[in-house]
From Swiss-Prot:
<dbReference type="InterPro" id="IPR000387">
    <property type="entry name" value="Tyr_Pase_dom"/>
</dbReference>
<feature type="binding site">
    <location>
        <position position="443"/>
    </location>
    <ligand>
        <name>a 1,2-diacyl-sn-glycero-3-phospho-(1D-myo-inositol-3-phosphate)</name>
    </ligand>
</feature>
<keyword id="KW-0472">Membrane</keyword>
<feature type="binding site">
    <location>
        <position position="448"/>
    </location>
    <ligand>
        <name>phosphate</name>
    </ligand>
</feature>
<dbReference type="Pfam" id="PF02893">
    <property type="entry name" value="GRAM"/>
</dbReference>
<feature type="region of interest" description="Disordered">
    <location>
        <begin position="1"/>
        <end position="55"/>
    </location>
</feature>
<keyword id="KW-1003">Cell membrane</keyword>
<keyword id="KW-0378">Hydrolase</keyword>
<feature type="compositionally biased region" description="Low complexity">
    <location>
        <begin position="649"/>
        <end position="661"/>
    </location>
</feature>
<feature type="modified residue" description="Phosphoserine">
    <location>
        <position position="53"/>
    </location>
</feature>
<dbReference type="InterPro" id="IPR003595">
    <property type="entry name" value="Tyr_Pase_cat"/>
</dbReference>
<feature type="region of interest" description="Disordered">
    <location>
        <begin position="644"/>
        <end position="669"/>
    </location>
</feature>
<feature type="region of interest" description="Required for dimerization">
    <location>
        <begin position="612"/>
        <end position="669"/>
    </location>
</feature>
<feature type="compositionally biased region" description="Low complexity">
    <location>
        <begin position="1"/>
        <end position="17"/>
    </location>
</feature>
<comment type="function">
    <text>Could also dephosphorylate phosphatidylinositol 3,5-bisphosphate to produce phosphatidylinositol 5-phosphate.</text>
</comment>
<comment type="subunit">
    <text>Homodimer.</text>
</comment>
<feature type="modified residue" description="N-acetylmethionine">
    <location>
        <position position="1"/>
    </location>
</feature>
Amino acid sequence: MDRPVAAAAAASAASCEGAGGPGPGPGASWRPSRVAGGASASSRHPSIETLDSPTGSHVEWCKQLIAATISSQISGSVTSENVSRDYKALRDGNKLAQMEEAPLFPGESIKAIVKDVIYICPFMGAVSGTLTVTDFKMYFKNVERDPHFVLDVPLGVISRVEKIGAQSHGDNSCGIEIVCKDMRNLRLAYKQEEQRKLGIFENLNKHAFPLSNGQVLFAFNYKEKFPVNGWKVYDPVSEYKRQGLPNESWKISKINSNYEFCDTYPAIIVVPTSVKDDDLSKVAAFRAKGRVPVLSWIHPESQATITRCSQPLVGPNDKRCKEDEKYLQTIMDANAQSHKLTIFDARQNSVADTNKAKGGGYENESAYPNAELIFLEIHNIHVMRESLRKLKEIVYPSIDESHWLSNVDGTHWLEYIRVLLAGAVRIADKIESGKTSVVIHCSDGWDRTSQLTSLAMLMLDSYYRTIKGFEALIEKEWISFGHRFALRVGHGDDNHADADRSPIFLQFIDCVWQMTRQFPSAFEFNELFLITILDHLYSCLFGTFLCNCEQQRIKEDVYTNTISLWSYINSQLDEFSNPFFVNYENHVLYPVASMSHLELWVNYYVRWNPRMRPQMPIHQNLKELLAIKAELQKRVEDLQREMATRTISSSSERGSSPTHSATPVHTSV
C-alpha cells in the first residue's frame, strides 16, 4: 500500500462535535431545571506499536475497533527504526509467528489459524496474510507490509457467510464472502486443501452464529475487569424518584415483579394511584401483549406525562373496554393544567386500519372523551430494513459521486429520519408548550414507541443529554421496556433473512446524532460515544443489548454473567466527552425536522471507505482540547487564589483602612 492510501486507511472515524455559540443551539426553550439523582485489569491486546509486547489494554483495542477503518489496526506511527527491526525479525520463524498471532481478550480462545489467506480489499486490492478465527473475532494480519495490515472483525457483526468462486486466484482456490451488519462486506480466498483440513467456512459459521449451533454468545465468556460496574447505571426507583415520583397521582407498582402481569414489561412500572390491580388486569387484556399505558416521564411543573403502551384490541367491530377508557381519563385528570389528552399513534393510518381488521386497531375518539388521536405516519420495520439495504448498496464498497445526492434520496433513509424526528418534536411540544399529557403507541409498543418516547424525553430533559443520563435512557426506554434487540439484530443467529430484523435502534441513534449536529454544545457525549454504542450493539462482547426483554435477561443471568457496555465506557469518560458541552439544565431542544437540516452520517455509514474519512481523527483533537481546557481552568483557579491572597495581604497592611473584598473572576473556558 502506498503511503497516502495508508494514511487515509488508518484515519479514525471522526467525532464531529461542532463548536457552538453561547446557547445549546437553535430551537431551544427555557424552563426551570430538575435536579438529577453514581484499576481496569490489563488484557492481552497489543497495539501495532507494541508488537514486541504480549500484553496491551482493552481500551486501546476497542478504540481501534471503533476507529472503524478497513484496515483498522494499521499503525501509521511505527518509526523506520522499528520497521527495520521488525523486518529483520521476519527471518526468525518464531518471531514471525509471534507477530502474526492474534491478541486475545480474557476468556477468548483460538479455533483455527490459516496461512496464505488472501483478503480481497475493495480499496487496496489483494492482501495476503494469516487468518485467525476465535470464538469472538475474525483476525486477519499481514506483517510484510509497511505498516502492518490488520483486519479485526467481531463475529457478532456478521450477518451471513457464503461460499464464492475464486478462480482468479487459481484453480486450487476457494473463497467466502462475509456480509456484515455494519455496512461492509468482506471477501477472502484460500487454498482448497486448507478448507478441507481446517474447515474455515464451517469454523466461521459455527462461531459467528453460536446460538444456531448450540453454543453461548461470547459475552458470557468475556472475563475483563473494569473499575466501574455499568449494571448500576440505571435503577428504576432512583430514576422515578429523580422525576418526583411517586406523588399523589402516580404510584410505583410492583404488580409485574414476577413478570406475570406482562412478560415484556419491566418488573417496576408507574401507573395512576387510583387504579386497582383488578382494573389494571382488565386494561391489559384489552391491550396488545398486555402492554398497558405506563408512565415514562413527567413534567416537573405542569405534571403533563408521557405514557407508553401498545395498540388497543378494538378489532373490526369496534370493541370497547370501559376500564381502558376510564384508565386514560385518569391519566388526563392527573394533569390539572389541561383537560385534553393526546394519543400519538406512530403508525400510518392505513396500516392501523389493516391492524384493526386483524383484531388490533386504535382508540375511537367517541369512546375516549377529550382525547385527540394523531397518526405520525411512520413506516413499519420491513420498510426500514429495505431502506437500510438500499443505503448499504450506495455506500459500500464504492460511491457514485455523480449521482450521490439522488442515490441517497432514493433510499428514503433521511426522509424516515425526518419523519421520526418530526413526530418526537410534536410530542415534546405538546408536553412543553401545550401542557398536555400524551399517550404513545404503535402496534406492540416496543419499536416506534421506544424511538418516540426516548427522543421526546431527550428533547425535554437535559439529564438524558449527559453521558450517564443517556445510558439510563437507553436502559429504561429500550432495554427494560422490551425492545426486541435479539430479534431485531439477530445476535448469534444464522437466519439472516428473518423478517423480524430491522434497524430500529440504529435509527434512534442516527436521530440523536442529527440533534448533536444542530445543538453541538447541548450534549455531554461526542460522536465516538454513539459509534461505540452501535458497534457493540452487534459485537456480543457485552451483555447490554442481549435478549428481548428484562425477564429473559434475568432468566439467562445476563446481569451476573456478562459485563455491561457502560462499564467500559464509564471507565474512560474522557474518551467520549464533548469539550463544547454546556449543561443547559433549563432548556428544551426543538431540532429542525427538515430535509435541509439533515445529513447522512458519513462517519458511521461510509467509514469503511478510506477516501471518505478525515486524515486526522477529530475525536483525538477533541481530547486534546479537553486537556487544554482543564489546564486553562486550573490556571484561572490559581490566579483567583493568588488575587484573593493579595487582597487579604493588602487589607492587613492598610490596618484600620476599610476592607474591600475582591470581585471574583468568572471566566468561561
